[in-house]
Regions:
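Residue-level preference for hydrophobic side chains embedded in well-ordered alpha helices
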Residues: 15-19, 79, 97
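Short amphipathic alpha-helix that is part of the acyltransferase structural core
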Residues: 1-38
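Conserved beta-strand in the GNAT
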Residues: 51, 57-67, 78, 83
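Conserved GNAT acetyl-CoA-binding A-motif
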Residues: 105-117
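Conserved active-site tyrosine of GNAT-family acetyltransferases
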Residues: 123
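Conserved acetyl-CoA-binding loop-helix of GNAT-fold acetyltransferases
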Residues: 81-84, 90-103
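A short helix-loop-beta-strand connector motif used in the catalytic cores of GNAT acetyltransferases and
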Residues: 39-51, 78
């Protein structure tokens, strides 16, 4: 398994279709933001879309961004759009994305990363 940044990938159209195929409305929203070129406007210029992949399969994805859905706020950065495809759930694969975000945050000198959800007991 490998964690990659969507915007560093040569397979962007492939990964976009995988994100779009998720059974979650926020996945569709993320795909729309990517497709219409407004992702960075929505979440910040330094944002990343992290993908956990195995070959050409997308296992999990999330964002690491300056802004999320709670605005206005001084809190930053945010982990958002956290999703694991159903067939991969229960194996803690998304933890690999969390570890990558923790690594990026440490490199940036950021002591905390925030996550927002309206789901109870999901994370």
């Amino acid at each position: 398994m490998q964690v990659i940044n969507y915007y560093d990938s040569n397979w962007q159209p492939h990964w976009l279709e995988k994100i779009r195929s998720s059974d979650w409305s926020a996945g569709a929203l993320l795909a729309e933001l990517i497709s219409n070129g407004t992702f960075f406007d929505a979440v910040g210029e330094e944002a990343k879309i992290l993908l956990l992949t195995e070959g050409d399969e997308l296992i999990s994805f999330c964002t690491y961004a300056e802004r999320d859905d709670i605005q206005p706020t001084e809190l930053s950065p945010w982990m958002g759009f956290v999703y694991t495809f159903p067939e991969y759930r229960g194996h803690r694969y998304v933890g690999k994305l969390f570890e990558k975000i923790e690594h990026i945050a440490k490199e940036d000198g950021t002591p905390e990363v925030y996550i927002s959800t309206n789901h109870i007991g999901l994370y």
